[in-house]
C-alpha cells in the first residue's frame, strides 16, 4: 500500500513540475500553507507539490485527501527514499590513493592497506559499473599513477568493507573527466544508469558517497536535495589566444554539469547522484568547487548519451574520441544579443577542415547542432565536443547576404575530424595502438599543436595524417621523423586517416617510403 502510494506521489511530483501553472499555485498555496510549514523540514519543496495538487485534477486523474493525506505523503516519500538508498548504496565504493616515496615504497607503511584498520590520507569515491570488478570514478582523482598505489573498499554488509588492491586502470578520458579501474572482485552490484536528459530543475536527487565512512565502517553516507540548475560550467583556465582545439581542457568547462543543493564534501568525487527510481543520473565531482565555485553547491557529470558512449569505451580499455569542426568562433555583438539573437559567430574557417568542406564561411552564425540550440561559442564547441570523430552533424546556419537584406537560414552537414585531448601515460589505457616501426599516427587535427590555424594555411589537413609520437632510436626516428610532422603519402598512395595509413604500411615488407607535407621524403627501414 505504502509503496504504491510512493509511486503515485512520485508520478504526481514529476508531472506537477512540468505541468503546474501560476494560477493553480496561487489558488492552493494559501489553503495548504499551514500543512506545508509543518512538513517542510522533512521534505522541503516536495510536500508543497503534493499538497498543491491535493484535490486538483492532473492529466485526467485525481489525487485528493481521501487517497493521500499529508502524513501519508510524508511516509510514502520517506519509504521511497529509504528504498532507493538501500538499492543503490551497495554499488558505491571508496578509493584510496596511497603515495609512494622516492624508493617506490608506500609512505603509509605502518598499517597494511589491505587491513580493515587502514584509513588513507587521500580518498575518493567510485561507482561499480560491472559485476566483474569495474569501477567508475573521476579521472582527476587518480593523480600521477606512477607515484601512487590505489585500493578500493567495497561494502559487504553486515560485515566491514572488503578492501582490494587495484589491478589496473582500464582507460581514462581527461576530456570528460572519467576513468574506469579494475579490481579483483566478483559478484559486485552494478549501478543502474538513468537518463539525465529527462532532468528538470526542482527534481529530487540523492547523493551517495563519503569514502572515509565506507573505508572505516563499510557504510555509504547519503544526502538529498533537488536539481538546482543544469548545463553549468566548470571554471576554466585562461583560453589561448585564438581558441583552437586546446581552448578548453574539459567538456564540462563548456556547460554540462548538473548543480544540486545536496551536500557534497571533498572526497565525494566519483560518487553517485541518483533519482528516486534508483538510477544514477550523475557522477558527483568536487572539481568544480575546487576551481572556485560556491562551496554550498554540488556538481555532477550528467549521465547522457556522451557519458554512456565514453563509459563503454573505457570499460573496453579504449580511449574515446571526440569531434573537431575547424572553426574559430566568438559571441554575437551586444546589440544582436539585446535583439534576442543567439548563436556562435564564425570568425575563421580553417582550410582543410570539416568546416571548410561543409561550406561554412567567415561571418556565418551557427544556431543549431543536430537540432540542439546553440546560444554562444561555448555551446557550439560543447555540442561538437560531445560527438565522436567521423560523426556527421547537421548545422543550422544564418548567413548575412552581401546586400543588406534579411539573413538567410539554411542547413549544412559536416563530417567531423578528431579533436586533440590531453595525452595520458600508456599505463592508463589498456587497448592502445602499437607503434609501427616506432611511429604513432593520428588525425592531422588531433596533434595538439599550438599553431594549427597557422599550419592549416600551408598544410592540407584533409589530405594527410599527423605524427603523434616517435619512439627514440626506432626506425622512424632514425629516418628523421618527429612528432608534429604530417604525412601525405605511403609510397604512391594518399592517406587522410590513421586507419588507412595502418592498412597501407601493414601490407608492405621491407623499406617503406613516406612523403611528408614539408616536401621531404623519408624511407623507414624494417625493424
PLM segments and residue spans:
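Bacterial N-terminal signal peptides
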Residues: 43-57
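Signal peptide processing junction and immediate N-terminal pro/mature segment
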Residues: 55-66
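Serine-dependent protease modules
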Residues: 64-358, 368-392, 398-436, 509
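Conserved catalytic motifs of ABC-family nucleotide-binding domains
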Residues: 363, 484
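Extracytoplasmic/periplasm-facing segments of secreted or lipoprotein envelope proteins
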Residues: 433-462, 467-475
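Short, exposed beta-strand-loop hairpins at the edges of beta-sheets
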Residues: 513-516
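Short, low-complexity, Pro/Ser/Thr/Gly-rich segments in the mature regions of secreted, periplasmic
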Residues: 518-526
Amino acid at each position: 500500500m505504502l509503496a504504491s502510494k510512493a509511486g503515485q506521489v512520485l508520478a504526481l511530483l514529476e508531472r506537477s513540475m512540468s505541468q503546474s501553472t501560476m494560477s493553480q499555485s496561487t489558488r492552493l498555496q494559501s489553503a495548504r500553507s499551514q500543512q506545508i510549514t509543518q512538513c517542510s523540514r522533512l521534505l522541503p519543496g516536495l510536500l508543497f507539490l503534493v499538497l498543491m495538487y491535493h484535490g486538483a485534477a492532473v492529466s485526467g486523474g485525481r489525487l485528493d485527501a481521501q487517497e493521500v493525506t499529508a502524513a501519508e505523503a510524508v511516509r510514502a516519500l520517506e519509504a521511497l527514499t529509504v528504498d532507493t538508498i538501500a538499492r543503490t548504496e551497495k554499488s558505491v565504493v571508496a578509493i584510496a590513493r596511497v603515495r609512494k616515496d622516492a624508493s617506490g615504497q608506500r609512505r603509509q607503511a605502518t598499517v597494511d592497506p589491505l587491513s580493515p584498520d587502514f584509513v588513507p590520507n587521500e580518498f575518493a569515491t567510485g561507482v561499480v559499473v560491472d559485476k566483474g570488478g569495474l569501477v567508475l570514478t573521476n579521472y582527476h582523482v587518480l593523480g600521477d599513477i606512477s607515484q601512487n598505489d590505489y585500493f578500493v573498499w567495497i561494502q559487504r554488509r553486515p560485515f566491514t568493507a572488503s578492501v582490494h588492491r587495484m589491478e589496473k586502470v582500464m582507460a581514462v578520458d581527461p576530456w570528460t573527466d572519467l576513468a574506469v579501474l579494475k579490481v579483483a572482485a566478483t559478484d559486485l552490484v552494478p549501478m543502474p544508469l538513468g537518463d539525465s536528459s529527462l532532468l528538470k530543475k526542482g527534481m529530487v536527487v540523492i547523493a551517495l558517497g563519503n569514502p572515509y565512512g565506507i573505508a572505516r565502517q563499510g557504510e555509504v553516507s547519503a544526502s538529498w536535495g533537488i536539481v538546482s540548475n543544469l548545463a553549468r560550467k566548470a571554471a576554466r583556465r585562461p583560453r589561448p589566444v585564438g581558441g583552437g582545439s586546446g581552448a578548453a581542457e574539459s567538456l564540462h568547462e563548456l556547460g554540462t554539469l548538473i548543480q544540486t543543493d545536496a551536500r557534497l564534501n571533498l572526497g565525494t568525487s566519483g560518487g553517485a547522484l541518483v533519482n528516486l527510481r534508483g538510477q544514477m543520473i550523475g557522477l558527483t565531482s568536487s572539481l568544480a568547487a575546487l576551481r572556485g565555485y560556491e562551496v554550498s553547491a554540488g556538481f555532477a557529470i550528467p549521465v547522457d548519451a556522451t557519458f554512456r558512449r565514453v563509459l563503454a569505451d573505457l570499460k573496453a580499455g579504449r580511449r574515446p574520441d571526440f569531434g573537431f569542426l575547424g572553426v574559430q568562433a566568438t559571441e554575437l555583438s551586444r546589440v544582436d544579443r539585446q535583439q534576442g539573437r543567439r548563436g556562435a559567430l564564425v570568425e575563421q574557417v580553417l582550410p582543410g577542415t570539416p568546416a571548410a568542406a561543409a561550406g561554412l564561411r567567415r561571418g556565418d552564425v551557427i544556431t543549431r547542432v543536430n537540432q540542439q540550440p546553440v546560444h554562444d561559442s561555448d555551446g557550439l564547441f560543447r555540442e561538437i565536443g560531445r560527438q565522436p570523430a567521423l560523426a556527421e552533424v547537421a548545422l543550422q546556419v544564418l548567413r548575412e547576404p552581401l546586400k543588406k537584406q534579411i539573413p538567410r537560414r539554411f542547413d549544412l552537414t559536416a563530417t567531423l575530424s578528431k579533436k586533440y585531448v590531453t595525452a595520458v601515460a600508456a599505463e592508463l589505457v589498456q587497448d592502445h595502438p602499437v607503434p609501427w616501426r616506432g611511429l604513432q599516427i593520428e588525425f592531422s587535427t588531433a596533434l595538439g599543436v599550438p599553431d594549427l590555424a597557422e599550419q592549416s594555411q600551408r598544410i592540407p589537413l584533409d589530405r594527410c595524417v599527423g605524427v603523434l609520437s616517435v619512439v627514440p632510436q626506432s626506425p622512424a626516428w632514425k629516418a628523421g621523423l618527429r612528432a608534429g610532422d604530417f604525412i601525405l603519402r605511403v609510397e604512391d598512395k594518399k592517406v587522410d586517416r590513421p586507419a588507412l595509413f595502418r592498412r597501407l604500411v601493414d601490407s608492405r615488407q621491407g623499406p617503406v617510403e613516406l612523403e611528408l607535407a614539408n616536401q621531404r621524403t623519408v624511407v623507414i627501414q624494417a625493424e
